[in-house]
Amino acid sequence: MDMIIEVVATAVWTMLPAYVPNNVAVLTGGGAPIDGGRTLGGRRILGDGKTWRGTGFGTLAGVAVALGLNTILPILTRVGADLTPFSLEAAVGLAFGAMLGDIVASFFKRRSGRRRGVPFPVIDQLDFVVGGILCAVILAPRWVIATFTPPVVIAVFILTPILHLGTNAGAYVLGFKKEPY
């Protein structure tokens, strides 16, 4: 049981800098869309939901979360937690990669004819995870190899959809989102 708790704690800890950016982007977005309103094949490339401001603030928030977690790590270590600190490269990779993963998914969502806010099952729940991990691999490969053990990766891919759907439902109830998914 202790091993399961350790794996789950590591999975959540490690992914927090990737979990936060898209939520912050929803709260701080608006302004100029990344695609500048351009279309491809008669459809918006990304849509109004992907903005420079949201991407910038989301990335900064994810990096800030990682740095904040590093600040409290000594306290957690004293009570027995065995968690990995974030290098700046890992923090940037996870945060920016989460935003980039969501942007890439939006591109494919538009190509498939889905409008903004229409569900894209599995992709909606995991795009930011894949983007975050891939960018972290590029910027901090040793950190990723040391941190993302196979059990942690499995936990991330199981927990993330549950957390994603739960936070989206909460954001809907609080009026931050127009749909509960």
UniProtKB/Swiss-Prot annotation:
The chain crosses the membrane at residues 56-76, 88-108, 120-140, 143-163. Its EC number is 2.7.7.67. One of its GO terms (cellular component) is plasma membrane. It is a multi-pass membrane protein. GO terms for biological process: glycerophospholipid biosynthetic process. It is found in: Cell membrane. GO terms for molecular function: CDP-2,3-bis-(O-geranylgeranyl)-sn-glycerol synthase activity. InterPro entries: CarS (IPR032690), CarS_archaea (IPR002726). Keywords: Cell membrane, Lipid biosynthesis, Lipid metabolism, Magnesium, Membrane, Phospholipid biosynthesis, Phospholipid metabolism, Transferase, Transmembrane, Transmembrane helix. It is an enzyme of class 2 (transferase). It catalyses: 2,3-bis-O-(geranylgeranyl)-sn-glycerol 1-phosphate + CTP + H(+) = CDP-2,3-bis-O-(geranylgeranyl)-sn-glycerol + diphosphate. Pathway: Membrane lipid metabolism; glycerophospholipid metabolism. Its cofactor is Mg(2+). Catalyzes the formation of CDP-2,3-bis-(O-geranylgeranyl)-sn-glycerol (CDP-archaeol) from 2,3-bis-(O-geranylgeranyl)-sn-glycerol 1-phosphate (DGGGP) and CTP. This reaction is the third ether-bond-formation step in the biosynthesis of archaeal membrane lipids. PANTHER family: CDP-ARCHAEOL SYNTHASE. Belongs to the CDP-archaeol synthase family. This is CDP-archaeol synthase.
